[in-house]
Amino acid sequence: MVESELSYEQIRLNRVEENKKRMGELNLNKLAQSLRVSSSSSSSSKPSPAKPRTMRIPVDFSEVRRSSRAKGPPPSYKEFGLEPLERRPRRSSRRRDLLNRVYASDDARMYAFDRAEKLQSSLDSEYASFTKPMLQSHVTGGFWLGLPLPFCKAHMPKRDVIMTLVDEEEEESQAKYLAQKNGLSGGWRGFAIDHQLVDGDAVVFHLIARTTFKVYIIRVNDDANNDSDGNEVNDDDSDGNEEDRDNDNESNEKQKETVSEGRQLRSSGKRKRRGRK
């Protein structure tokens, strides 16, 4: 046992010596000393001074004014008595007032159209012409007048142009012709209003130049152009009106008698009630 322990100790010592030699060969001792010196120097060195903290500027969250004018006084939220609001009167539009529109009867419309065709037949056939009966959408109720398609294809320009409308008094007006839509647009409504066109009127357009229409207006309510047949009818109507007046007078007298009898009965009934009381 003693010999074994000595041999083990001897082996350990031999190993330690070998390790020291190797460390010497590798200069590990010097490296360890240099590390110790560096660590001691770093611990003994003075710490670097801390950088001074800069003061932060407080942020202003108020609204930035970009106007050069002086700022007005702050708003006041005090409660004051409110004055009653005045309602503005509504502006009545003649164009939208459908109740005031007057529509021509079929007989009057056909009568005006027949007179317009007679006038058209008397015009110079060298220049093209057509007759157009007026509707509400053609006059005050709208701003557009469609022209006959065959007439437009045969005689009207192929592009948009400004047409001149010359009335019977040689007064000129301007209206824009739209080639793709075959009608008059800008300026037609003003012409219709200025010449007081209404539903049922018949208008004759005579193309006296490439961009000029001579316009003849036949009024639906023009009594001066009525024929003699109309006068005879009026005479017959006058006789019938006299008979109607006589009948009305008799009926009025009967109504007066019945009213007077009713008043007498009421007065007698009131007297009886007073006597009972």
Curated annotation (Swiss-Prot):
SMART domains in the cross-refs: B3 (SM01019)
Domain of life: Eukaryota
Molecular functions (GO terms): DNA binding
Tagged with keyword DNA-binding: yes
Entry's localization field: Nucleus
Region (Disordered): 33-94, 224-277
One Gene Ontology cellular component: nucleus
Compositional bias annotation for Acidic residues: 224-250
Pfam hit, one: B3
Residue ranges for the DNA-binding region feature of this UniProt entry: 130-221
PANTHER family named among the record's database cross-references: B3 DOMAIN-CONTAINING PROTEIN OS06G0194400, B3 DOMAIN-CONTAINING PROTEIN OS11G0197600-RELATED
Protein name: B3 domain-containing protein At3g19184
